[in-house]
């Protein structure tokens, strides 16, 4: 997998965490750079850890389903991307927002480490599934998870900083964009591995 694809996947995966970071930034009474760094480290760390776990699982079964790798990547990324889009347009409040709001007390909002761990896990489950597909795509897993973690950290830091001003609007658009990006990457991988365009043109 080329570097551009890894970066795009990283951005797509980070959109869910970005959306929650915006929510956190909007609910914290006084947003500081140190708080943004702390939130970014939690989300970036888990977003890097989950693909590694998924990759480890996928490696164990590589010999059995290597011939289906492109289908696995397409299906996983499409399901994840579709879920992100669906979650962003449904009317009910997102569950991750409910977790964050449960820790709100009056105007001064509490965002302790336990809260961040719960939110980081909730927003990195998709990365676990993507990690499984990495096992069949010949990627450098260490470089990949470093990129994913770093991009997520930066994006979440930015999300916290701007959450106060444009939280709700940007949250929805970020999740939709992330979903579309993941679906397109899945289609790209499928086309490359099957060389299907050569049969059409």
Curated annotation (Swiss-Prot):
State a GO cellular component annotated for this protein: plasma membrane
Keyword set includes Mitochondrion: no
Q: Which residues form a coiled coil?
A: none
Q: What is its main location?
A: membrane
Name the UniProt key words of this record, in alphabetical order.
Cell membrane, Ion transport, Manganese, Membrane, Transmembrane, Transmembrane helix, Transport
- A single GO molecular function, which one? manganese ion transmembrane transporter activity
Tree of life domain: Bacteria
Q: How does it sit in the membrane?
A: Multi-pass membrane protein
Entry function: Probably functions as a manganese efflux pump.
Instruction: Report the protein name in the record.
Output: Putative manganese efflux pump MntP 2
Q: What is the species listed in this Swiss-Prot or TrEMBL entry? A: Clostridium botulinum (strain Langeland / NCTC 10281 / Type F)
Gene this chain is encoded by? mntP2
